[in-house]
Protein backbone atom coordinates (compact mmCIF):
# COMPACT_ATOMS: atom_id res chain seq x y z
CA UNK A 1 0.00 0.00 0.00
CA UNK A 2 3.74 -2.79 0.64
CA UNK A 3 10.64 -5.76 3.03
CA UNK A 4 10.10 -8.81 5.09
CA UNK A 5 12.89 -11.38 4.93
CA UNK A 6 10.69 -13.79 3.01
CA UNK A 7 9.83 -11.05 0.51
CA UNK A 8 6.25 -10.69 1.68
CA UNK A 9 6.71 -6.98 1.68
CA UNK A 10 5.12 -4.78 4.27
CA UNK A 11 2.43 -7.18 5.45
CA UNK A 12 0.89 -10.62 5.53
CA UNK A 13 -0.40 -12.45 2.49
CA UNK A 14 -4.10 -11.83 2.21
CA UNK A 15 -6.66 -9.71 4.00
CA UNK A 16 -9.60 -11.82 5.20
CA UNK A 17 -12.99 -10.35 4.60
CA UNK A 18 -14.04 -10.21 8.22
CA UNK A 19 -16.70 -8.10 9.89
CA UNK A 20 -18.14 -7.59 6.41
CA UNK A 21 -15.44 -5.06 5.60
CA UNK A 22 -15.83 -4.56 1.88
CA UNK A 23 -12.68 -4.79 -0.17
CA UNK A 24 -13.15 -1.24 -1.35
CA UNK A 25 -12.60 0.05 2.18
CA UNK A 26 -9.41 -1.98 2.37
CA UNK A 27 -8.24 -1.46 -1.21
CA UNK A 28 -4.81 -0.07 -0.69
CA UNK A 29 -1.26 -0.48 -1.74
CA UNK A 30 -0.22 -1.02 1.87
CA UNK A 31 2.57 -3.39 2.65
CA UNK A 32 2.25 -5.41 -0.52
CA UNK A 33 4.99 -4.08 -2.76
CA UNK A 34 6.08 -7.51 -3.89
CA UNK A 35 2.84 -9.46 -3.55
CA UNK A 36 1.13 -8.36 -6.70
CA UNK A 37 -1.17 -10.28 -8.97
CA UNK A 38 -1.39 -8.73 -12.36
CA UNK A 39 -4.45 -8.46 -14.43
CA UNK A 40 -4.19 -7.06 -17.92
CA UNK A 41 -4.97 -3.41 -17.36
CA UNK A 42 -3.76 -1.85 -20.59
CA UNK A 43 -4.01 1.89 -20.74
CA UNK A 44 -2.96 4.52 -23.25
CA UNK A 45 -4.77 3.51 -26.42
CA UNK A 46 -7.23 1.45 -24.39
CA UNK A 47 -7.92 -0.08 -21.01
CA UNK A 48 -8.14 -3.82 -20.47
CA UNK A 49 -9.41 -4.53 -17.03
CA UNK A 50 -8.64 -7.73 -15.16
CA UNK A 51 -8.57 -8.42 -11.46
CA UNK A 52 -7.15 -11.54 -9.87
CA UNK A 53 -8.02 -13.76 -12.80
CA UNK A 54 -11.48 -12.33 -13.41
CA UNK A 55 -12.74 -11.90 -17.00
CA UNK A 56 -11.38 -8.88 -18.81
CA UNK A 57 -13.23 -6.03 -20.44
CA UNK A 58 -11.97 -3.28 -22.69
CA UNK A 59 -12.67 0.43 -22.54
CA UNK A 60 -11.27 2.90 -25.04
CA UNK A 61 -9.19 5.62 -23.47
CA UNK A 62 -10.18 9.16 -24.36
CA UNK A 63 -6.57 10.31 -24.49
CA UNK A 64 -5.75 12.58 -27.45
CA UNK A 65 -4.06 11.37 -30.59
CA UNK A 66 -0.25 11.13 -30.52
CA UNK A 67 1.28 14.56 -30.86
CA UNK A 68 4.45 14.50 -32.91
CA UNK A 69 4.77 18.22 -32.32
CA UNK A 70 5.39 17.62 -28.62
CA UNK A 71 9.07 18.20 -27.84
CA UNK A 72 9.03 15.04 -25.73
CA UNK A 73 7.56 12.81 -28.42
CA UNK A 74 9.68 10.75 -30.79
CA UNK A 75 10.62 12.42 -34.11
CA UNK A 76 8.52 9.90 -36.04
CA UNK A 77 5.50 10.47 -33.84
CA UNK A 78 5.45 6.80 -32.88
CA UNK A 79 4.67 5.92 -29.28
CA UNK A 80 7.04 3.82 -27.22
CA UNK A 81 5.17 1.01 -25.49
CA UNK A 82 5.83 0.92 -21.74
CA UNK A 83 4.39 -1.25 -18.98
CA UNK A 84 4.15 -0.01 -15.39
CA UNK A 85 3.22 -2.46 -12.65
CA UNK A 86 1.42 -1.22 -9.55
CA UNK A 87 1.53 -2.95 -6.20
CA UNK A 88 -2.14 -3.18 -5.29
CA UNK A 89 -5.66 -2.90 -6.69
CA UNK A 90 -6.51 0.32 -8.51
CA UNK A 91 -7.18 3.17 -6.10
CA UNK A 92 -6.70 6.88 -5.55
CA UNK A 93 -3.17 6.27 -4.24
CA UNK A 94 -2.28 5.40 -7.84
CA UNK A 95 -4.25 8.30 -9.25
CA UNK A 96 -1.44 10.30 -10.80
CA UNK A 97 -0.43 7.45 -13.07
CA UNK A 98 -4.01 6.87 -14.20
CA UNK A 99 -4.41 10.61 -14.74
CA UNK A 100 -1.38 10.65 -17.02
CA UNK A 101 -3.10 7.98 -19.11
CA UNK A 102 -6.58 9.45 -19.07
CA UNK A 103 -5.54 12.99 -19.99
CA UNK A 104 -2.95 12.03 -22.60
CA UNK A 105 0.11 13.19 -20.68
CA UNK A 106 2.02 10.00 -21.40
CA UNK A 107 1.21 10.33 -25.09
CA UNK A 108 2.54 13.88 -25.05
CA UNK A 109 5.83 12.34 -23.96
CA UNK A 110 5.81 9.76 -26.73
CA UNK A 111 4.69 6.90 -24.49
CA UNK A 112 1.92 4.33 -24.86
CA UNK A 113 1.69 3.21 -21.24
CA UNK A 114 0.15 -0.02 -20.01
CA UNK A 115 -0.61 -0.15 -16.29
CA UNK A 116 -0.71 -3.67 -14.88
CA UNK A 117 -2.77 -3.58 -11.74
CA UNK A 118 -1.38 -5.22 -8.63
CA UNK A 119 -2.83 -7.46 -5.98
CA UNK A 120 -1.65 -10.35 -3.82
CA UNK A 121 0.54 -13.31 -4.74
CA UNK A 122 2.81 -12.26 -7.63
CA UNK A 123 6.38 -11.06 -7.14
CA UNK A 124 6.81 -7.65 -8.78
CA UNK A 125 10.59 -7.71 -8.70
CA UNK A 126 10.60 -10.99 -10.59
CA UNK A 127 8.30 -9.50 -13.22
CA UNK A 128 10.53 -6.45 -13.51
CA UNK A 129 13.76 -8.38 -13.80
CA UNK A 130 12.15 -10.93 -16.11
CA UNK A 131 11.06 -8.22 -18.54
CA UNK A 132 7.30 -8.58 -18.07
CA UNK A 133 7.10 -4.95 -16.95
CA UNK A 134 9.38 -1.96 -17.55
CA UNK A 135 8.72 -0.02 -14.34
CA UNK A 136 7.36 -1.03 -10.96
CA UNK A 137 5.73 0.74 -8.03
CA UNK A 138 8.22 -0.04 -5.29
CA UNK A 139 9.21 0.71 -1.74
CA UNK A 140 12.48 1.84 -0.19
CA UNK A 141 13.23 -1.13 2.06
CA UNK A 142 12.70 -3.54 -0.82
CA UNK A 143 15.03 -1.47 -2.99
CA UNK A 144 17.74 -1.71 -0.35
CA UNK A 145 17.08 -5.41 0.10
CA UNK A 146 17.59 -5.82 -3.65
CA UNK A 147 21.09 -4.37 -3.29
CA UNK A 148 21.77 -6.90 -0.55
CA UNK A 149 20.61 -9.68 -2.88
CA UNK A 150 22.52 -8.32 -5.92
CA UNK A 151 19.34 -7.64 -7.87
CA UNK A 152 20.17 -4.86 -10.38
CA UNK A 153 17.15 -2.60 -10.07
CA UNK A 154 17.09 1.07 -9.10
CA UNK A 155 14.59 3.59 -7.75
CA UNK A 156 14.31 6.64 -10.03
CA UNK A 157 11.52 8.66 -8.36
CA UNK A 158 9.31 8.66 -5.26
CA UNK A 159 5.74 9.89 -5.67
CA UNK A 160 4.99 9.71 -1.94
CA UNK A 161 7.18 11.84 0.30
CA UNK A 162 5.49 10.22 3.29
CA UNK A 163 4.72 6.57 3.82
CA UNK A 164 1.00 6.44 4.72
CA UNK A 165 1.57 3.94 7.54
CA UNK A 166 -0.36 4.89 10.69
CA UNK A 167 -1.10 3.62 14.16
CA UNK A 168 -4.69 3.93 15.35
CA UNK A 169 -5.91 4.32 18.92
CA UNK A 170 -9.25 4.72 20.66
CA UNK A 171 -10.25 8.27 21.60
CA UNK A 172 -10.67 7.05 25.19
CA UNK A 173 -6.91 6.53 25.35
CA UNK A 174 -6.43 10.31 25.17
CA UNK A 175 -3.09 9.64 23.47
CA UNK A 176 -1.41 12.75 22.08
CA UNK A 177 1.57 11.20 20.31
CA UNK A 178 3.24 7.91 19.45
CA UNK A 179 5.10 8.12 22.75
CA UNK A 180 1.78 7.72 24.56
CA UNK A 181 1.18 4.36 22.87
CA UNK A 182 4.23 2.69 24.37
CA UNK A 183 3.39 -0.52 26.27
CA UNK A 184 -0.16 -0.70 24.88
CA UNK A 185 -1.21 -3.91 23.10
CA UNK A 186 -0.45 -3.19 19.45
CA UNK A 187 -1.80 -5.21 16.54
CA UNK A 188 0.76 -5.37 13.72
CA UNK A 189 1.43 -7.64 10.76
CA UNK A 190 4.52 -9.83 10.57
CA UNK A 191 6.27 -7.62 8.03
CA UNK A 192 6.23 -4.69 10.46
CA UNK A 193 9.19 -6.38 12.10
CA UNK A 194 11.38 -5.32 9.19
CA UNK A 195 9.75 -1.97 8.41
CA UNK A 196 8.24 0.36 10.99
CA UNK A 197 8.53 -1.67 14.21
CA UNK A 198 12.33 -1.27 14.43
CA UNK A 199 11.79 2.49 14.10
CA UNK A 200 9.25 2.51 16.94
CA UNK A 201 11.58 0.48 19.14
CA UNK A 202 14.55 2.71 18.41
CA UNK A 203 12.80 6.07 18.80
CA UNK A 204 10.01 5.43 21.29
CA UNK A 205 11.24 2.35 23.19
CA UNK A 206 8.36 0.15 22.09
CA UNK A 207 8.87 -3.45 23.16
CA UNK A 208 8.13 -6.77 21.50
CA UNK A 209 6.04 -7.66 24.53
CA UNK A 210 3.30 -5.30 23.38
CA UNK A 211 2.98 -6.84 19.90
CA UNK A 212 -0.16 -8.69 18.95
CA UNK A 213 -0.75 -10.45 15.60
CA UNK A 214 -2.80 -8.42 13.13
CA UNK A 215 -4.68 -10.34 10.44
CA UNK A 216 -6.63 -7.46 8.91
CA UNK A 217 -9.51 -8.09 11.28
CA UNK A 218 -10.32 -4.99 13.36
CA UNK A 219 -12.45 -6.91 15.86
CA UNK A 220 -9.71 -7.27 18.51
CA UNK A 221 -8.91 -3.56 18.27
CA UNK A 222 -12.55 -2.55 18.42
CA UNK A 223 -13.09 -4.74 21.49
CA UNK A 224 -10.17 -3.34 23.53
CA UNK A 225 -10.17 0.39 24.18
CA UNK A 226 -6.54 0.23 25.32
CA UNK A 227 -5.40 -1.37 22.06
CA UNK A 228 -3.49 0.09 19.12
CA UNK A 229 -3.68 -1.10 15.51
CA UNK A 230 -1.58 -0.53 12.43
CA UNK A 231 -3.26 0.90 9.38
CA UNK A 232 -3.01 2.80 6.13
CA UNK A 233 -3.91 6.48 6.33
CA UNK A 234 -6.52 6.40 3.61
CA UNK A 235 -8.15 3.07 4.48
CA UNK A 236 -8.37 1.89 8.09
CA UNK A 237 -9.55 5.15 9.68
CA UNK A 238 -12.53 5.18 7.34
CA UNK A 239 -13.17 1.47 7.90
CA UNK A 240 -13.05 1.92 11.69
CA UNK A 241 -15.46 4.85 11.44
CA UNK A 242 -17.91 2.75 9.47
CA UNK A 243 -17.53 -0.49 11.44
CA UNK A 244 -16.91 0.86 14.92
CA UNK A 245 -18.96 4.02 14.79
CA UNK A 246 -16.21 6.31 16.04
CA UNK A 247 -13.27 8.35 14.77
CA UNK A 248 -10.01 6.70 15.81
CA UNK A 249 -6.98 8.72 16.81
CA UNK A 250 -4.61 8.65 13.85
CA UNK A 251 -0.83 8.89 14.17
CA UNK A 252 1.05 9.09 10.88
CA UNK A 253 4.46 7.55 11.48
CA UNK A 254 6.06 9.79 8.87
CA UNK A 255 5.25 12.82 11.01
CA UNK A 256 7.29 11.29 13.83
CA UNK A 257 10.44 10.58 11.86
CA UNK A 258 9.67 7.36 10.01
CA UNK A 259 11.05 8.47 6.70
CA UNK A 260 11.08 5.96 3.84
CA UNK A 261 9.70 7.15 0.54
CA UNK A 262 6.74 5.26 -0.85
CA UNK A 263 4.97 4.65 -4.17
CA UNK A 264 8.28 4.78 -5.98
CA UNK A 265 9.19 4.14 -9.59
CA UNK A 266 11.73 1.36 -10.07
CA UNK A 267 13.34 -0.03 -13.20
CA UNK A 268 16.29 -2.16 -14.18
CA UNK A 269 19.71 -0.58 -13.84
CA UNK A 270 20.32 -1.55 -17.46
CA UNK A 271 17.42 0.65 -18.61
CA UNK A 272 18.92 3.63 -16.78
CA UNK A 273 22.27 2.92 -18.43
CA UNK A 274 21.00 2.25 -21.94
CA UNK A 275 17.99 4.55 -22.34
CA UNK A 276 18.02 7.34 -19.76
CA UNK A 277 15.85 9.50 -22.04
CA UNK A 278 13.04 6.95 -21.84
CA UNK A 279 13.31 6.82 -18.05
CA UNK A 280 13.26 10.61 -17.86
CA UNK A 281 10.16 10.86 -20.04
CA UNK A 282 8.27 8.31 -17.98
CA UNK A 283 9.24 10.00 -14.72
CA UNK A 284 8.38 13.49 -15.96
CA UNK A 285 5.03 12.44 -17.39
CA UNK A 286 4.13 10.56 -14.21
CA UNK A 287 4.98 13.61 -12.10
CA UNK A 288 2.79 15.80 -14.29
CA UNK A 289 0.04 13.23 -13.92
CA UNK A 290 0.22 13.61 -10.15
CA UNK A 291 0.06 17.40 -10.33
CA UNK A 292 -2.98 17.11 -12.57
CA UNK A 293 -4.66 14.58 -10.30
CA UNK A 294 -4.18 16.57 -7.09
CA UNK A 295 -4.58 20.10 -8.42
CA UNK A 296 -6.98 19.64 -11.33
CA UNK A 297 -10.01 17.51 -12.04
CA UNK A 298 -9.33 13.92 -10.90
CA UNK A 299 -12.43 12.56 -12.63
CA UNK A 300 -10.61 11.12 -15.68
CA UNK A 301 -8.31 9.00 -13.52
CA UNK A 302 -11.09 8.05 -11.13
CA UNK A 303 -13.14 6.69 -14.01
CA UNK A 304 -10.30 4.37 -15.01
CA UNK A 305 -9.69 3.37 -11.39
CA UNK A 306 -13.33 2.38 -10.90
CA UNK A 307 -13.44 0.64 -14.25
CA UNK A 308 -10.53 -1.55 -13.30
CA UNK A 309 -11.66 -2.00 -9.70
CA UNK A 310 -15.47 -2.02 -9.69
CA UNK A 311 -15.61 -2.36 -5.90
CA UNK A 312 -13.86 0.98 -5.41
CA UNK A 313 -16.34 3.62 -4.28
CA UNK A 314 -16.51 7.35 -4.83
CA UNK A 315 -16.51 7.76 -1.04
CA UNK A 316 -13.23 5.86 -0.67
CA UNK A 317 -11.59 7.72 -3.55
CA UNK A 318 -12.60 11.12 -2.18
CA UNK A 319 -11.47 10.18 1.32
CA UNK A 320 -8.09 9.05 0.01
CA UNK A 321 -7.54 12.22 -2.01
CA UNK A 322 -8.45 14.37 0.99
CA UNK A 323 -6.02 12.53 3.25
CA UNK A 324 -3.18 12.65 0.72
CA UNK A 325 -3.59 16.42 0.56
CA UNK A 326 -4.22 16.98 4.28
CA UNK A 327 -1.13 15.07 5.39
CA UNK A 328 1.19 16.08 2.56
CA UNK A 329 1.70 12.52 1.40
CA UNK A 330 2.69 13.59 -2.12
CA UNK A 331 3.70 17.23 -1.70
CA UNK A 332 5.80 17.95 1.37
CA UNK A 333 9.47 18.17 2.26
CA UNK A 334 11.76 18.61 -0.72
CA UNK A 335 8.85 18.06 -3.13
CA UNK A 336 7.50 21.49 -2.19
CA UNK A 337 10.41 23.14 -4.01
CA UNK A 338 12.01 20.40 -6.11
CA UNK A 339 8.79 18.93 -7.43
CA UNK A 340 6.76 15.77 -6.93
CA UNK A 341 8.93 12.68 -7.12
CA UNK A 342 11.80 14.37 -5.29
CA UNK A 343 14.35 12.31 -3.37
CA UNK A 344 17.45 13.26 -1.39
CA UNK A 345 20.57 11.45 -0.26
CA UNK A 346 19.83 12.54 3.30
CA UNK A 347 16.45 10.80 3.40
CA UNK A 348 17.81 7.54 2.04
CA UNK A 349 20.70 7.63 4.50
CA UNK A 350 18.41 8.37 7.43
CA UNK A 351 16.18 5.39 6.71
CA UNK A 352 19.12 3.09 6.09
CA UNK A 353 20.83 4.17 9.31
CA UNK A 354 17.67 3.38 11.30
CA UNK A 355 17.23 -0.03 9.72
CA UNK A 356 20.88 -1.01 9.86
CA UNK A 357 21.05 0.19 13.45
CA UNK A 358 18.33 -2.32 14.29
CA UNK A 359 20.05 -5.11 12.38
CA UNK A 360 17.70 -5.22 9.40
CA UNK A 361 20.54 -4.47 6.97
CA UNK A 362 24.30 -4.77 7.45
CA UNK A 363 25.84 -1.36 8.06
CA UNK A 364 28.45 -2.06 5.37
CA UNK A 365 25.83 -2.41 2.62
CA UNK A 366 26.24 0.05 -0.26
CA UNK A 367 22.61 1.21 -0.06
CA UNK A 368 23.26 4.06 -2.51
CA UNK A 369 23.06 1.51 -5.31
CA UNK A 370 19.33 1.36 -4.60
CA UNK A 371 18.54 4.75 -6.12
CA UNK A 372 19.58 7.60 -8.38
CA UNK A 373 18.67 11.28 -8.20
CA UNK A 374 19.41 12.06 -11.86
CA UNK A 375 15.76 11.97 -12.96
CA UNK A 376 14.14 14.09 -10.23
CA UNK A 377 14.59 17.37 -8.33
CA UNK A 378 14.06 19.54 -11.42
CA UNK A 379 12.07 22.16 -9.50
CA UNK A 380 8.32 22.76 -9.43
CA UNK A 381 8.41 25.07 -12.46
CA UNK A 382 9.81 22.28 -14.64
CA UNK A 383 6.48 20.47 -14.47
CA UNK A 384 4.19 23.41 -15.21
CA UNK A 385 4.52 23.44 -18.98
Question: In which residue ranges do the predicted regions lie?
Answer:
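Conserved C-terminal helix/tail region of periplasmic/extracytoplasmic solute-binding proteins
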Residues: 345-385
